[in-house]
């Protein structure tokens, strides 16, 4: 680990932080414990197998943002608690000054490069995020500015009222990094490096391409010393290999165990929990056969999701009910029936390319079943399967007619409106369906403006109905988390939002 300056001030932070809220973020590790110069808990390194390698050089502005948060590398001003509400993180408190302005009070904390977390550094980090292109998904449809306010405050102003801004700032893509992350004079505004520049309990010290990463404990972390002295992360896209690694003791924790492999693990090592992740069929509405709403309707009516639940997920999933599934506990009672759907046309042998990725091993199986169902309905279907990092850019560019992916609907902001804006509006940064519909944009914009928890939920469900009414997306199943965990390991975080995996209390 790199040697860093540790001031009396930062030592004081460590001593006082031991009683503070534990971090719920994740990380990677390898064998062999060591003592910490700072004292406190100290245990062996953790060995963790993750399904997805970094696709964008660990940029916090894209898909790699959740890798960083799950590894315990990055944090935002806020976090989400178990109920999905905003909770303190780098900001210990906040208040709303008017409809468009919030003031966040920072706690004393230190970046992994040894510099202090200051209002100026935080404001600069948020400003860099607003300039990233494409925009981070947490900022879909939102314009904001940030400026330091005194010795411990940051004032954030939005162009339009944003009642869920504290939840939005919990998004992994809005992680706070030190000025060093952006290069001299901010020369890397769109591609900051989180290596040694974040604030979490674990610091990336070595990246071995897309194969593995080494993390060491951040001994000056504001929340106290993590039990594990580090993490050795392996990126293992093959789900069977991840399950075998748990079974043989080669890793301590393996995420995304395939349903087909769950029965092969000893029951004490199998951990499962509900998640807000939905697997969906996204149809390209801008080019190709699915530009025709009638053919999109034909695809929707061809799908039998119960066959996927039983045949592919072996009961570890629920049939697709909408963009929001049963883990979003309030959604079902507020769901609105889609209206104005096109009448299904006969496909007549229309030729389509269906793409998916194999980092989640169930997805190719899902794609094969969907391929068969679409072919039975009269489509000619070519299936293309790649590793996610080799697929994402083509999918976003609309090079496929249909795409099957798994998306956590509350991952980016914890706000149900957030995913609707990023995934289904004209300016959305993760719009795989390439949908641009005036009615959808209008209903999502109305939801964005809506204040009050219940009222905002109602508005989100109205927007969901408008989106489903276009048949741009066909919800297939709502997934469960299945993880393999050694019986020697304690404190693994099974987070329904999938932002966290390893916390400061995770140990063996």
Please provide the spans of the model-predicted regions:
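Structural transition elements
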Residues: 314-348, 360-362
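Ligand-site clamp/hinge motif
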Residues: 218-263
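N-terminal lobe/hinge region of extracytoplasmic solute-binding protein
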Residues: 49-98, 127, 197
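Long beta-strand-rich cores associated with HINT superfamily self-processing modules
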Residues: 483-508
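Periplasmic-binding protein-like
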Residues: 286-327, 365, 467-472
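Extracytoplasmic/peripheral linker and loop segments enriched in polar/acidic and small residues
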Residues: 389-390, 421-486
């Amino acid at each position: 680990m790199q040697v860093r300056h540790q001031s009396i001030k930062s030592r004081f932070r460590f001593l006082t932080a031991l009683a503070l809220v534990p971090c719920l973020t994740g990380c990677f590790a390898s064998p062999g414990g060591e003592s910490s110069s700072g004292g406190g808990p100290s245990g062996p390194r953790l060995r963790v197998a993750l399904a997805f390698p970094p696709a964008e050089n660990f940029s916090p502005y894209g898909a790699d943002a959740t890798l960083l948060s799950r590894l315990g590398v990055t944090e935002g001003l806020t976090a989400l608690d178990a109920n999905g509400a905003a909770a303190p993180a780098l900001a210990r408190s906040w208040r709303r000054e008017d409809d468009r302005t919030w003031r966040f009070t920072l706690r004393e904390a230190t970046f992994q490069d040894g510099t202090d977390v200051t209002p100026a550094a935080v404001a600069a980090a948020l400003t860099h995020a607003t300039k990233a292109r494409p925009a981070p998904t947490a900022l879909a449809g939102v314009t904001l500015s940030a400026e330091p306010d005194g010795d411990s405050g940051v004032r954030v102003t939005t162009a339009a009222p944003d009642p869920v801004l504290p939840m939005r700032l919990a998004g992994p893509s809005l992680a706070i990094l030190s000025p060093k992350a952006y290069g001299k004079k901010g020369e890397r505004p769109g591609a900051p490096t989180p290596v040694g520049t974040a604030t979490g309990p674990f610091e990336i010290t070595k990246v071995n391409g897309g194969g593995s990463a080494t993390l060491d404990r951040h001994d000056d972390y504001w929340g106290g010393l993590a039990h594990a002295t580090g993490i050795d992360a392996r990126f293992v896209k093959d789900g069977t290999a991840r399950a075998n690694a748990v079974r043989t003791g080669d890793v301590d924790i393996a995420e995304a165990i395939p349903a087909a492999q769950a029965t092969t693990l000893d029951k004490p090592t199998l951990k499962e929990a509900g998640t807000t992740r939905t697997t969906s069929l996204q149809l390209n509405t801008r080019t190709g056969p699915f530009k025709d709403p009638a053919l999109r309707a034909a695809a929707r009516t061809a799908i039998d999701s119960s066959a996927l639940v039983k045949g592919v997920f072996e009961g570890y999933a629920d049939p697709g009910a909408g963009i929001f599934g049963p883990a979003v506990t309030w959604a079902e009672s507020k769901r609105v029936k889609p209206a104005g759907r096109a009448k299904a046309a006969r496909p007549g042998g229309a030729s389509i390319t269906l793409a998916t990725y194999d980092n989640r091993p169930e997805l190719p199986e899902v794609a094969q079943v969907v391929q068969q169902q679409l072919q039975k309905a009269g489509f000619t279907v070519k299936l293309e399967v790649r590793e996610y990092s080799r697929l994402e850019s083509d999918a976003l560019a609309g090079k496929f007619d249909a795409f099957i992916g798994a998306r956590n609907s509350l991952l980016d902001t914890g706000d149900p409106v957030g995913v609707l804006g990023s995934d289904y509006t004209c300016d959305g940064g993760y719009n795989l369906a390439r949908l641009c519909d005036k009615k959808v944009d209008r209903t999502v914009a109305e939801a964005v403006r809506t204040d009050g928890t219940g009222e905002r939920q109602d508005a989100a469900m109205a927007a969901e109905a408008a989106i489903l009414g276009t048949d741009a997306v066909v919800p297939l199943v709502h997934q469960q988390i299945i993880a393999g965990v050694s019986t020697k390991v304690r404190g693994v975080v099974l987070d329904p939002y999938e932002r966290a995996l390893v916390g400061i209390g995770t140990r063996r």
